[in-house]
């Protein structure tokens, strides 16, 4: 239920939780969310989602409304390298109908807490410059833009 207060603010419950099983609502959500994130990527298959869930290094986090509807998702990867434990955030997307409500912030803060609990020294992410709101959110949370280059090698 949404309660409207004076000033036009909506109050609603959002739960952030790790995904523990592939469900129809999860696959349906990815069919809607992935095109909002990338026009060049296809939604993951049930098998791909299952491999992520079973992975020791990756976790899918979702933001659910009070009715269990999935409003957003992200992937957190935590990994050990010779210089310590690191974490990486990928594929952060909040449904366009739910943006501006702090859901992206809640997802990121949950991921940061999980990374901290796992002993990560740092958490990195990338964001296209055109995603102005997302970039501002990351700065507001405390991410610092690094002076580095990101390179990609593609097998496709």
Place the predicted regions along the sequence by residue.
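Conserved N-terminal entry element of GNAT/NAT acetyltransferase domains
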Residues: 2-24
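Active-site rim helix/loop that mediates acceptor-substrate recognition in acyltransferases
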Residues: 9, 41-60
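Helix-loop element at the rim of GNAT/NAT acetyltransferase active sites that forms part
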Residues: 31-43
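Conserved beta-strand in the GNAT
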Residues: 62, 69-78, 88, 93
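A conserved beta-turn-beta hairpin within the catalytic core of GNAT-like acetyltransferases
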Residues: 79-89, 99, 146
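Conserved acetyl-CoA-binding loop-helix of GNAT-fold acetyltransferases
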Residues: 94, 100-113, 140
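Conserved active-site alpha-helix within GNAT-family acetyltransferase domains
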Residues: 105, 117, 129-147, 152-153
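Conserved GNAT acetyl-CoA-binding A-motif
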Residues: 115-127
């Amino acid at each position: 239920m949404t309660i409207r207060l004076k000033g036009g603010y909506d109050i609603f419950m959002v739960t952030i939780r790790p995904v523990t099983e592939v469900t129809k609502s999860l696959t349906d959500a990815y069919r809607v969310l992935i095109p909002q994130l990338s026009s060049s990527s296809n939604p993951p298959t049930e098998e791909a989602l299952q491999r992520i869930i079973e992975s020791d290094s990756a976790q899918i986090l979702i933001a659910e409304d009070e009715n269990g509807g999935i409003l957003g998702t992200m992937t957190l990867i935590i990994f050990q390298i010779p210089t310590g434990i690191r974490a990486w955030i990928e594929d952060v997307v909040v449904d366009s109908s739910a943006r501006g409500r702090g859901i992206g912030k809640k997802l990121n803060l949950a991921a940061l807490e999980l990374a901290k609990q796992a002993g990560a020294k740092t958490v990195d992410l990338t964001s296209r410059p055109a995603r102005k709101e997302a970039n501002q959110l990351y700065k507001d949370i405390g991410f610092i833009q690094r002076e580095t280059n990101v390179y990609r090698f593609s097998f496709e």
